[in-house]
A protein has these predicted regions:
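Conserved acidic carboxylate
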Residues: 11
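C-terminal output helix
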Residues: 109-119
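Acidic, metal-coordinating helix/loop segments flanking the phosphotransfer/catalytic sites
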Residues: 33-51
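Charged docking surfaces used in two-component/phosphorelay signaling
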Residues: 18-26
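Receiver (REC) domain active-site loop signature in two-component systems and cognate sites
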Residues: 58
């Protein structure tokens, strides 16, 4: 059974990143952080996280581009991606999902709802891997 609950948080706003990191660590998760998609891509190539929480508007590489790159790479397409963004129009949400995000949550978000969503995807990922190993 997988016990590695490593999350990658990709967020360029330090306050938002630290708040979310604290909440995820309180739930028992290890959290790695990147401030842009380019650095996040390097991190994913080094050690695959169980789940990615991703902002959209970031320097160097935006969240949509990062999401597309991961979901079209067979090594990483299984990693759940939850976009958390201040871009709240229906077209923004549709674009995020079309890029391969598993969820699109608008800011400001309810922290309990976000942590519940993270838990749902982590639980699903662990069950899929465990059933594949049987």
């Amino acid at each position: 059974m997988i016990d590695n609950r490593q999350l990658l948080l990709v967020e360029d706003d330090l306050y938002s990143a630290e708040t979310l990191k604290f909440a995820m660590e309180a739930k028992g998760h290890k959290v790695a952080m990147a401030t842009n998609g380019k650095d996040a891509l390097t991190m994913v190539n080094g050690e695959q996280p169980q789940l990615i929480i991703l902002d959209v508007m970031m320097p160097k590489m935006d969240g949509y581009h990062f999401c597309r790159l991961l979901k079209f790479d067979t090594r990483f397409k299984h990693i759940p991606i939850i976009i958390v963004s201040s871009k709240i129009q229906d077209a923004d949400r549709e674009l995020g999902l079309a890029c391969g995000a598993d969820e699109y949550i608008a800011k400001p978000y309810d922290l309990n709802m976000l942590t519940d969503t993270v838990e749902k995807y982590l639980h699903s990922t662990v069950e899929e891997v465990n059933s594949a190993n049987i």
